[in-house]
Design a protein with these regions (language model features):
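His/Asp/Glu-enriched short active-site or ligand-binding loop at hydrolase and phosphoryl-transfer sites
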Residues: 44-55, 95-103
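Alpha/beta catalytic cores of nucleotide-metabolism and tRNA/nucleoside-modifying enzymes
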Residues: 1-18, 64-75, 82-153
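Short loop/helix-cap segments at secondary-structure boundaries that form the rim of catalytic
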Residues: 34-42, 85-90
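Hydrophobic faces of well-ordered beta-strands that scaffold small-molecule active sites
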Residues: 23-27, 46-48, 73-78, 92-96
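Short, polar loop motifs at secondary-structure junctions
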Residues: 29-32, 80-84
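Active-site beta->alpha loop and helix N-cap motifs at the rims of alpha/beta catalytic domains
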Residues: 1-33, 38, 45-52
């Protein structure tokens, strides 16, 4: 993945697949939309990236435009942990580090209603349990859509 150079990213993904590594191409915020459409034609799954640190509203517009262009398609989200965005779009998979960084770096705990608790060493069990509940909620929310996509992987 070469953030800021969509052509190099596509070339790297193609080469990995050529060598038998089932790489998933990543479409970054700010890349030409035509590349996303091409990825969707050529690969069974694609990823959306380049969103870490961006405002949620900007992420939402980007994700909405991506889904409008490629749905139904398996889509992975890099750097998306927002419950609102995960409930709004049928991601096949997603990952983010905010489950850990929110509490430890900024004192923001989803498990406690986004309450700010700082200081000392933190036990992240409550936060992990909150995200596991969110995962179950999303599985129920998007059950029909995932069935349409053919399940796993």
């Amino acid at each position: 993945d070469v953030i800021g150079n969509p052509v190099a990213s596509a070339r790297n993904c193609e080469e990995m697949n050529r060598q038998g590594i089932p790489a998933i191409p990543t479409f970054h915020l700010g890349s030409p939309w035509s590349m996303l459409v091409d990825m969707a034609k050529d690969y069974p799954k694609l990823a959306l990236g380049g969103m870490v640190g961006k405002p949620t509203a900007l992420k939402g517009r980007f994700i909405g435009q991506a889904f409008a262009r490629v749905w139904p398609k398996k889509v992975h989200a890099f750097g998306v942990g927002s419950r609102r965005l995960l409930r709004k779009y049928p991601f096949h998979s997603a990952d983010a580090s905010n489950w850990e960084q929110g509490p430890t770096a900024y004192g923001r705990w989803q498990a406690y209603g986004n309450m700010s608790v700082r200081g000392g060493s933190q036990n992240l069990r409550g936060e992990v349990e909150w995200y596991l509940r969110l995962e179950r909620e999303l599985q129920g929310r998007w059950h029909k859509e995932m069935k349409l996509l053919g399940g796993q992987p």
